[in-house]
Curated annotation (Swiss-Prot):
Pfam families according to UniProt: DMRL_synthase
Keyword Transferase set for record: yes
Catalysed conversion reaction: (2S)-2-hydroxy-3-oxobutyl phosphate + 5-amino-6-(D-ribitylamino)uracil = 6,7-dimethyl-8-(1-D-ribityl)lumazine + phosphate + 2 H2O + H(+)
SUPFAM superfamilies associated with the record: Lumazine synthase (SSF52121)
GO BP of this protein: riboflavin biosynthetic process
PANTHER family associated with the record: 6,7-DIMETHYL-8-RIBITYLLUMAZINE SYNTHASE (PTHR21058:SF0), 6,7-DIMETHYL-8-RIBITYLLUMAZINE SYNTHASE DMRL SYNTHASE LUMAZINE SYNTHASE (PTHR21058)
EC number annotated for this UniProt entry: 2.5.1.78
List of residues binding (2S)-2-hydroxy-3-oxobutyl phosphate: 85-86, 127
GO terms for MF: 6,7-dimethyl-8-ribityllumazine synthase activity
Keyword Transferase: yes
Protein name: 6,7-dimethyl-8-ribityllumazine synthase
Species: Moorella thermoacetica (strain ATCC 39073 / JCM 9320)
Amino acid sequence: MPNIMEGQLEGRGLKFGIVVSRFNEFITSRLLDGALDALNRHGADPGAIDIAWVPGAFEIPLTAQKMAARGYDAVICLGAVIRGATPHFEYVAAEVTKGIAQVSLNSGVPVIYGLITADNIEQAIERAGTKAGNKGFDAAMTAMEMANLFKVMAR
């Protein structure tokens, strides 16, 4: 019979880093509220949660890398990149996505992608707690599950 390994949705005993982009703060603050709500509902100690605000999404991967190196069980990355009239959206969204994945792979720490990439403000608002749930909440749930899975795998 195979040995099944799964992470539980439990925040107790875990330390979380959260990186939040200040750009589009009217969206990202809702993502942060969602992430904190999920962690709180699942028993995370508020004193074991550190939040780093960064100017924009492009600064998220480097800050996540610094957090991953400091002993967090998981790092949650939150931001909102909204398409405009120039190709800036594609550049930022692609590089931030690659950067977050690279930090996770290089550090061995779950670094969770909780960014909204949207065509317009309405889509971003929907994904930050209205019609389409809250991507910050979802990212925190993933962070807890992955951190606990890694603890199971380390046994």
